[in-house]
């Protein structure tokens, strides 16, 4: 039975409990990749009550905000970022429904969400001239197309699908995962975030249960993009924290001091002055990333799901952009520095510590970090308002 979580502190405690369950099996799930669906890990997440924490109060949910979601995601990502990423789009779709869904759509889908059922995504496509050049179409109430990078779709109850309608307008359709004409593949073959199993989904005249005008969501000041990016940032910061934790544990229990460190008087690896300097610097940067994430989340709490003005929307978007850009850099850095700190033995395959770097590098290219810095600079130097889309 899925529990209900109504308070921030309870959500954080639950996330830590889930993380404690996930951590021992993270390396095994990484090695298995798409060859084994992480059913037990996902069941722990689904049964925890965390899937429903952002459902609005008006729709029967607890209505917890970005600060709660960011902290929950960061904690779980530090244990297993693949499992943390599975519900990333789930929370975005909840936000879209909350703002743009009609009462019938919200009741249908939020009832399932509050019962511990997930919303998966089928938003991305390949082969077009650009990322928004969609081929998937809705006509006559059915959906036809092929989607890639469908995180969460394989084991979800519903799939949110971006498509063009008869008029060429962007819409968001919801179809049952087990409905007619829906086929989700396990062809996810990448170096990192392997247990997300973000494979290909094919829709062949699949009946659509709910349709939302998605284009209009980004034609007004909005925070959907910023809130979606906040969870992406939390995954990166969680990876950084997990890498730092494993570096600390390895240094304390397995690493030996180098010849030069012994000559300098070190009795253990943790006494090596260069290790101490590098670790201290890295720990500071990881904590800075955590602080920037928390600050961005607090800003989104203040702005709200529907911003009062373009200025408020800009404030939220830029706060998250900074957290996402810096968090991505620190995640890759921490995962690489782990080996410089811990030494050659830490590269042994049996430890699977390279999964931190593979996860960070794979997830960090979800969308370009350089454009985050570009828009931050454009606003501060020239008062140029950032764009309004799903990645900002």
Positions of PLM-derived features:
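Glycine-rich phosphate/pyrophosphate-binding beta-alpha loops
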Residues: 148-153, 228-231, 363-366
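A short core secondary-structure module
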Residues: 149-184
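Glycine-rich beta->alpha junctions and the first turn(s) of the following alpha-helix
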Residues: 190-287
